[in-house]
Amino acid sequence: MNFTGSIMLVDDEAHIRKFISLLLRHLGISRIYEAPNGSEAIELFKKVRPDLVMLDVNMPVMDGLETLKALKEVDENCVVVMLTSLANRQTIDTAVNLGAANYIRKDAPPEEIGRALAETIDSCFEDAEPGEEPK
Amino acid sequence: MDDVTEPPTIDLKGRRILAVDDDRINLRIIGGILRHEGYEIAEASSGEQALEVYAAFKPNLVLLDVMMPGIDGFTTCRTLKKTYGDKCAPVIFVTAKSEADDVVMGFDAGGVDYLAKPFRPKEVVARIRTHLSNQQLVEQQKDLVAQLSKANLAKDRFLGMCAHDLRNPLSSIRGLAELMDEDAIGVLTGEQKEIIRTIHAASQSMLQLVNELLDVATIEAGHLKLNKAATSIAELVERSVHLSRMEAAKKSTRIEMVRTEKDPIVEVDRDKMKQVVDNLISNAVKYSPKGSVITVIVHSDADAAGFAVRDNGPGIPDNERHKLFKDYGRLSSIPTGGEKSTGLGLAICRKIVEAHNGTIGYSNIGGSGAEFFVSLPLPK
């Protein structure tokens, strides 16, 4: 994948963060930020301004949808991909209405997650690759 | 299930009967017969009194005289039915012989049976026993249904917990193992590779088991919701073929796709139908000898379209074909690469395909393999 931007990964489960971040590194993405909950995610987002956010739906205290709303308030153009396990159509529709770019099943094998992520990146960053030096 | 507790045998002793008659002698006769049988009896000498006694006594059965001063038997019965609805005890009318109209009106008013005066004790006892047994069976059945729905709810909740608390960690373990196998954290030694592949295979089969159990639970609970969208069968199949090639390559099995010039479009739930394609292809890989060729064919005709998966495996023995597509219908065939099987995959496929009004089937191809096919109606 020739995505040179940064990604912020938000999930309350450490093993998921470990898995997805290793996958991202394996795909050649080096700037990865992690947050274990919604409120830390918002703080971190303000500080590092990642190009893309991968956001878990099911989190205690502040769930993915609330976090998504808050992120969109900080930056309405931020690219957010929801991470779900069992795809719940209603939740996904709500997330898309709130401005999520896509959703990815985190229980899928690495190859499928990679492909879904690549599709999102292709469709969201058609014109200019973020973080890329202008040619 | 083989060991469900048997319902208790029917014991009618102590069941409560309300006898209503304005004739004291009749009441005494019938009371005598019934007490002798071990029933508990309450008496009322008018319709009005019957309504009062009913409320306090809560009988299991009512013997109701038709002709009474004040409100008659029919009116009393209608009032009882109206007040207590489904919970109302069965009512048997007591009527003088030869009054055929009474009998009809009695049934209309909600009675379950009638007894003709003068009483023949054996007939009274037999009929009352029949109705009390029926009523008790209905009650027991209601109780059982209530208990079963409770148990089913508990099962669903348990499986829901499995969904979240087992699936996520299992997918992480599987994903991490796969990434390590691809040298994502550095090159592994031969032994390390072997171990990481064992971890991968074990977590993969556990994940599959949990997923299949969950699918069955969801489908059985009637929660299979289809999010249909116009879908190209060829595209759907191609995706699955692409993803299955890696698994197949481990057994040096090739997957070939054959498609017609037509590109049939069907209305399906993509995720669910992909699951069917994945399952049929993965079965073909599982049961084919190493180094064989699996062919996936997309086909269509005037009003249906679908796909078929052919393999070079041993085929399904005729005497086991009835087990295909049934829950836990494991056959004698053994996966050729030591893969695991829950016996649920094809049952889930069948349920998904049927929910789409399609058909799924199987045929042996003349001793050289098996063919599974799915056919879906084309939108009109």
Feature map (PLM): residue ranges:
Chain A
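Receiver (REC) domain active-site loop signature in two-component systems and cognate sites
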Residues: 59
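Two-component/phosphorelay signaling modules centered on CheY-like receiver
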Residues: 14-33
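Active-site beta3 strand of CheY-like receiver
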Residues: 48-54
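C-terminal output helix
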Residues: 90, 108-121
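Alpha4 helix (beta4-alpha4-beta5 surface) of REC/receiver domains from two-component response regulators
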Residues: 66, 87-104, 108
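Two-component signal transduction core modules
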Residues: 53, 80, 103-104
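Acidic catalytic/metal-coordinating carboxylates
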Residues: 37-40, 63-66
